[in-house]
Regions:
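Accessory nucleic-acid engagement/destabilization modules that flank
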Residues: 4-253
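Beta-edge loop/turn motif
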Residues: 75, 286-287
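Conserved pre-motif I regulatory segment
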Residues: 247-284
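Beta-sheet entry/capping signal
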Residues: 138-140, 282-285
Length: 287
């Protein structure tokens, strides 16, 4: 990925860290979590729940799948600030040598998720997202490390703002073919959508930060890196019992029945009696 150039420094997003042991760039971790969120949506949620979500948001399943990947991939955009990046000694030296270091004094802890919430509200506003939707989806990202005390910290530096723009565009290209859109959200849908999206994000981030994906930096350097991560995600979900069991319905009465009177429960017997009284012969409905 090409870096942006501002003044005398030449750095790119692949040099900014999201994880340090082992190193993962913000782009690698973002793509990993985005793919995991998509796989959780497609494989963990029951088909009926997916259909209900699509109906609530008025979109097709492939559209919401793309959006979920894009949205989840941006969850750590708040780490793209000098005050966070400089927490790692090696990065602080690099920032100093590139005149990117900004002194920071604050007695409270820096919470990257809260910073990310504020960054995304502004970015999505610029991209034309509806106010209710952008506030909700940014707010969910702001809660993905729920319960932690600390502050959102934005240093409003032009080079770092360029990093934010580049990161958002990179994730949009990766998951949404560079086309921005955000589903509309009605007031009475906010609670259900918040619970579902927050759950998917927390689970995806937890899995993506674990040992099963510690080599994601190497995987994404391969030509088929995306496919490998999808397979790895499916394997993790399957081995750990996260996949929904498919519900199969018989298309032949003979496979499922008949239910004989002597083995029928009370409801079955009542149905039999109704059919007998109105003298209808043939197939029998049963529960």
């Amino acid at each position: 990925m090409a870096g942006f150039y501002y003044g005398d420094f030449d750095m790119n997003l692949q040099e900014l860290w999201a994880k340090t042991e082992p190193f993962q760039s913000v782009t690698t971790h973002g793509i990993t979590v985005g793919i995991l969120a998509q796989e959780i949506f497609l494989k963990y949620l029951a088909p009926g729940n997916r259909l209900l979500l699509c109906k609530l948001l008025g979109v097709e399943q492939h559209q919401i799948t793309e959006f979920i990947g894009y949205w989840a991939s941006l969850h750590d955009i708040g780490k793209i600030e000098c005050c966070f990046q400089s927490k790692h000694p090696g990065m602080k030296d690099k920032l100093l040598s590139n005149d990117l270091y900004i002194p920071f004094i604050n007695g409270n802890a820096i919470r990257h998720e809260k910073t990310g919430k504020e960054i995304l509200k502004d970015l999505w506003n610029t991209l034309g997202a509806e106010r209710r939707a952008r506030n909700l989806f940014a707010g969910i990202i702001g809660a993905h490390h729920q319960g932690k005390s600390g502050d959102a910290v934005r240093q409003f530096s032009a080079p770092w703002h360029q990093f934010h723009l580049e990161f958002e565009q990179s994730m949009r290209q990766h998951f949404m073919n560079d086309t921005f859109w955000m589903p509309s959200v009605l007031p009475d849908q906010k609670g259900a959508i918040c619970a579902l999206f927050l759950g998917m994000l927390i689970l995806a981030d937890w899995i993506g930060s674990g040992a099963s994906f510690q080599d994601a930096e190497f995987i994404l350097s391969q030509a088929d890196g995306n496919a490998i991560l999808e397979q790895r995600a499916d394997l993790f979900l399957s081995k750990n019992g996260f996949l929904s069991d498919p519900v199969s319905w018989s298309d032949r009465f003979a496979v499922s029945g008949p239910i004989f009177r002597k083995t029928a429960n009370g409801l079955h017997r009542q149905i039999w009696n109704i059919f007998f009284k109105i003298r209808i012969s043939g197939f029998v409905c049963f529960c």
